[in-house]
Each structure stands twice: as structure tokens, then as C-alpha cells.
Amino acid sequence: MSVITKIHARQIMDSRGNPTVEVDVYTESSFGRAAVPSGASTGVHEAVELRDNDKSVFLGKGVLKAVENVNTVINSALQGMDVTEQEEIDAKLLELDGTPNKSVLGANAILGVSLACAKAGAEYSALPLYRYIGGTTAKTLPVPMMNVLNGGAHADNTVDFQEFMIMPIGFERYSDALRCGAEVFHSLKALLHKRGLSTAVGDEGGFAPNVESNEQAIELVIEAIGLAGYKAGAPTDKGGLGDGHVMIALDPASSEFYDTEKKKYVFKKSSGRELSSEEMASYWADWASRYPIISIEDGMAEDDWEGWKLLTEKIGDRVQLVGDDLFVTNSKRLGEGIEKGVGNSILIKVNQIGTLTETLQAIDLAKRNGYTSVISHRSGETEDTTIAQIAVATNAGQIKTGSMSRSDRMAKYNELLRIEEMLGDTAVYPGIKAFRV
């Protein structure tokens, strides 16, 4: 029987030592478990993560209220529902909460239930989750965005931009691309050590050295690619991209250094330089001409629509421009962006929106309008590997899930290795074809 008999939540710990929600869903013949991630730099338009705010316990970060909501309200309402009816389950969860941002029950409570139900449904159907969600066409392994060097809100250093990532695009198999990423990661570690810079890793497994400038940060990554025996591709030479093995992706997290009063982008961690929206867009255009950059996420602040438009006009034809804080996995905000012609890609974080159904709707809307989707982790993660399954299920072609260290990140990469093995000769690794620029 596929009828839900019990839903139980508990408080567990995430990769940063903060509490998060884990949910178990039972039917008479199947079981599903999901753990919920949490972000450090969060967009103001995200669904609400319910915290206890009792400063005497876990510094206010406890999630017992969300756990109680699952064990009482949600458990009672969903018992007797068919676990394979995902859309009905998610609609019921939205009805129970009754708010647009899930502030009553908490997006962390709702998401845990939604994902655990999907896993229980997959087990009941005797299918891997990627096949259960995506059907027989699910066969594309994603190109990894590997966060190897950190700054911004993710590091105590002099780098303004949050993430410098490598994307191994010049390969035919996911497993070979993963090997490349690991080799570049270790080459970067050796390079930093040789320069007397820190090799300690941050929340997502990337290094956070105290380098002299934003430029030095990206140049270190490019040098490490060469030291590993690979070639960095050039973003403007479309015909020659196949000659390169690795390209650079950036997540500046520009909302974090945007001064809303001055309406300026302030490089407060490095030079103190202040740039207007037009100057910031020109700054990225200059970087895209000088460095092998294939993707920039949140190159402009989340509500700087004019700046986003300028950036898209300048480099949107040759660089993937990903909206994270801008779109927050929300179909309504993505629709607004499509109408205004800003960006050409959306970052997909399941906890930004709160249900699997809404996540899949955002991916579908992006696909129908020529936008790419990048399935993403959060800085606070667990051993849960659902996002790896979603990446393959939707044939998204790209995944952002940290560096080549920390088991909370490696769990996703390893799950993708298992899926590649399971798919065998039908597995597709898109490489540069994952991009539409």
C-alpha cells in the first residue's frame, strides 16, 4: 500500500554544527528520509526557515518548532494520502501553511516532508529517485561547479567575491570530469602552500587564503588548472572551447556588498572601491574578456533589476548569468526576470521555495524559456543526496555542490558516480553543451 501511515521529524545537525530538520515518511510498504539544508548568504525573497530563536539553546538556531509542526499538524493532515501523489501532497502542505513564504509551518518543515514523501514514493515504485521524478528520459549527468576558492561572506579574508569555481567541461564522462576537479583542487592546495597561504577550507570545502586582491584569487585558480595538466578554455572563442578542459564560474554574491542607500557596489573587504550598476556591469564584462569565465551567479544585487538588464545586454550572449538571490527558485520572480530579459539561468535551491513540486515547476519554466538551471546545495548541508538525484531527474546539466573536500559535499558527487554506473552506456555528460551561450 502506498498510503502514508506516519510522518516523524527530528532535530539533527548540519555541516556547520547548526540544527536542521530531518523527516521520515512511512507507508505500509515503503520509507523515505530527507534532511533539509540551510544557507549562510540568503536572499530576502526566500521562503522562511523557521528557527526557535531561544538564545539559550543552540544560540537561537534550534528547529524544534518546525519539528513539532511536522509531528503534529502535518503528520495528522497527510496520514491516509497516497505517497505517490506528489503534487497533491505539496498542495496540501501549502494549504496547511497558508502563507506565500511558508512562515507558519516553516519552509524547513515543509521541504523535509515533501522530499521524504518523494523518496518513499520512489521506494514504493521500486525506482531510483531520479527515475521516479524524471521518467525514462532522465540520463544527463551534471557538469559540476566546484567551489575551490572562497571570499565574501564565506571567508575571513580580503576577497570581496564569495565563490571562485571550476567547471570541467572538456570531458565525455562525469567520472573523468570529477577526476579533473579533484586534481585541480589538489594542485591549488599545493600552490597555496608553496606561496605561504592558508589551505584551511571553508563551509563548502573551498580554500579561503588571504590573497591580495580579487584578481589574484581568480589567477591562482587558473594557474592551478595548468599545474594539474589541464587547459583553461577561453569564453570568447566559441569555436575553441573544445580545446580547453576547465572553465571558471563565479558567484560574487553581489547583494552582500551592495549598499542600498548609496546604490553602489562597495568593495569593502579589499580596496573600498565604489561602483555604480553600470560600472559593475562593465567590470564583469572586462573580467569576461580577460579570464576564461563561462558563468557568473548574482553578478548584480537581488533587487538591482536595472543593473541585471545592463549586465545581460553586455555579456549575456557569451556568459551564463545565473540568478540566485534574484530568482530564489521562485517561478513568479523568474517569470518577472524572463519578461524583463534579465539573466539567462536560474540557480535551483530546494529550500528557497520549499516543495519538490514548486522546484520542478521553476526548472520547467526556465527550460521552456531558454534559461538553464543549476541545481545547488547550501553552505549548511547534510549527508542527504537528493539534489544529485534531482539534477539527473531534470536533465539540468549542471550542479553546484561544493569543492573536493568535506563529506557533506562529496556525498553528492559520489551519488552521481553511482548514478553514472547505473545508467551505463546511456549516461550523458554534456560538457560545454550544458550551456546556452
Swiss-Prot record:
The active site is at 204 (proton donor), 349 (proton acceptor). Catalyzes the reversible conversion of 2-phosphoglycerate (2-PG) into phosphoenolpyruvate (PEP). It is essential for the degradation of carbohydrates via glycolysis. Mg(2+) binds at residues 251, 297, 324. Keywords: Cytoplasm, Glycolysis, Lyase, Magnesium, Metal-binding, Secreted. It is found in: Cytoplasm; Secreted; Cell surface. One of its GO terms (biological process) is glycolytic process. The gene is eno. Binds a second Mg(2+) ion via substrate during catalysis. It catalyses: (2R)-2-phosphoglycerate = phosphoenolpyruvate + H2O. Belongs to the enolase family. Pfam families: Enolase_C, Enolase_N. It is an enzyme of class 4 (lyase). This is Enolase. GO terms for molecular function: magnesium ion binding; phosphopyruvate hydratase activity. Transmembrane segments: none annotated. Its cofactor is Mg(2+).
